[in-house]
């Protein structure tokens, strides 16, 4: 009987990156934290929904804190020491995500707000009537 063909698997090489960029996208419903290298290649990411929060609890500052912590710990494997934080969006998890990344042990070099602001572009959604 013929022997099964041996599968050749390539071992994934972890590269060592000393400084990265943390992209925090804080919407009203969720918070997404992505840690990339300087070129924009993603090293790790986490969301408040993926951290176990559902419904209205996804949009809390604590959920953003847990998501940032999760993404930060995953990026430590690459040897990231310092982060530049880019915050986008008006959500409630903006400050708590940055504070959480600081508590994980990263040296935060600078914090930039990259929220897109229209120069009178699209018409905004109608106001809520509660």
Curated annotation (Swiss-Prot):
- GO cellular component terms attached to this protein's record: ribonucleoprotein complex; ribosome
Q: What Gene Ontology molecular function terms does this protein carry?
A: rRNA binding; structural constituent of ribosome
Q: Which UniProt keywords apply?
A: Ribonucleoprotein, Ribosomal protein, RNA-binding, rRNA-binding
InterPro entries per UniProt: Ribosomal_uS11 (IPR001971), Ribosomal_uS11_bac-type (IPR019981), Ribosomal_uS11_CS (IPR018102), Ribosomal_uS11_sf (IPR036967)
Gene3D superfamilies listed in its UniProt record: Ribosomal protein S11
Q: GO biological process: what's one of them?
A: translation
Family (UniProt):
Belongs to the universal ribosomal protein uS11 family.
Q: Which HAMAP family match?
A: Ribosomal_uS11
The job of this chain, per UniProt, is described as:
Located on the platform of the 30S subunit, it bridges several disparate RNA helices of the 16S rRNA. Forms part of the Shine-Dalgarno cleft in the 70S ribosome.
Q: What is this protein called?
A: Small ribosomal subunit protein uS11
What organism is the protein native to? Answer: Xanthomonas campestris pv. campestris (strain B100)
